[in-house]
Amino acid sequence: MAQCGGGDVSRHRKGHLDTVESLCQGLLDDVMLDDDKCRAMFGYLQEWQDLASMCYGSLGGEPPLAPEASNGSGSTGGGGSFRKRRPDDAKGESNSICKRQRGKQQQQQQPCHPDQMAAAVGKGRPERARPGAKKKAEVASPKDSPATSASTVTAGQKTDYIHVRARRGQATDSHSLAERVRRERISERMRYLQELVPGCNKVTGKAGMLDEIINYVQSLQKQVEFLSMKIAASNPVVNFNIVEDLFGRQLSQAACNPAALPAMALPMAQVEPSCLQMSPLQQMQTSAGSSGYGLEMVVSNQYSPPGGPMSVPAGASVEPCLNVNGAAGWDIGSHGLFSGFDAPFQSVQSDCLLDNLKMEM
């Protein structure tokens, strides 16, 4: 009998377990349809834990755990607000929990190296990238393009001039090149002057060279002035325009009044009208009898006589003018010439011969 009673009890417990499992499964399946029943059941289990332990203890199972309250408001009252749980969400949470557990187990199984630990510590707090750092990196490593490649090629080749950016107050490359050419030309001319000026090779610097060249040119100018003065003193140039005017006046008076013609000794060849013209290239030869020195004087006649070409009239007598010796004696009014031509013209016999004195006109 006792054995029969024990078998009945075990069968009764199994039947209770089956009924409880079926009820729980039905509640989980129909949680969306019958939310109030689910809340009531779990609320009762939470309120009377002893009752739940007694029920599950009598059935030989463990009591279910209390569900987590939403937003940390898990109260012990039966009327506590629980979040709605869908079966899909429950399955997804269970899957995620399993995955997390597996991942943790794998991490625990894998050995960690010290380098990996340091990298993990460094990656724990990522630093924020500064806004200017990216631009600097782009400028430091520009993209490959034909323009950049050309610039790198030109940068590799050294230029003769200094590269200057075209900014305000600064020159461009073309301007600097023109300036370099201009300075080269100036240096070449300075070399030529340095070769011409004696003693300029010893001077260093363009300023000193220019001072030396200026001093040399000034000394040359002074030498030229001194030489010109010396030449003028050795070869005096006499202007006989006054003498020509005097002769022209006397000849005009003689043409008007032949009796007033002074005693002038003229050769026959000079009586012709062509010989009486006062041309600048006419040459006259006279001699100083007393001194005996030959004096060569250059007569510069720039103007023709006021009366133009003059001729001696046919009625004028020139026979008294001839000298016995065959030479022509000139009656020169020296007193009237040096007294301002105020005194009357007085004829003075002179023994000057034409062969000894040369007068270039």
Curated annotation (Swiss-Prot):
Together with BCL1, positive regulator of cell elongation at least partially through increased gibberellic acid (GA) biosynthesis. It holds the Pfam family HLH. It is found in: Nucleus. Residues 124-138 have a biased composition (Basic and acidic residues). Residues 146-157 have a biased composition (Polar residues). Residues 170-220 form the bHLH domain. Belongs to the bHLH protein family. One of its GO terms (molecular function) is protein dimerization activity. Keywords: Gibberellin signaling pathway, Nucleus, Transcription, Transcription regulation. It comes from Oryza sativa subsp. indica (Rice). Homodimer. Interacts with IBH1. Residues 170-183 are annotated as: Basic motif. Its main location: nucleus. InterPro entries: bHLH_dom, bHLH_ZIP_TF, HLH_DNA-bd_sf. GO terms for cellular component: nucleus. PANTHER family: BASIC HELIX-LOOP-HELIX PROTEIN 79 (PTHR12565:SF319), STEROL REGULATORY ELEMENT-BINDING PROTEIN (PTHR12565). One of its GO terms (biological process) is regulation of unidimensional cell growth. This is Basic helix-loop-helix protein 79. A motif (Nuclear localization signal) lies at residues 166-173. Residues 66-159 are annotated as: Disordered. The lineage of its organism: Eukaryota, Viridiplantae, Streptophyta, Embryophyta, Tracheophyta. It comes from the Eukaryota. Residues 184-220 are annotated as: Helix-loop-helix motif. Signal peptide: none annotated.
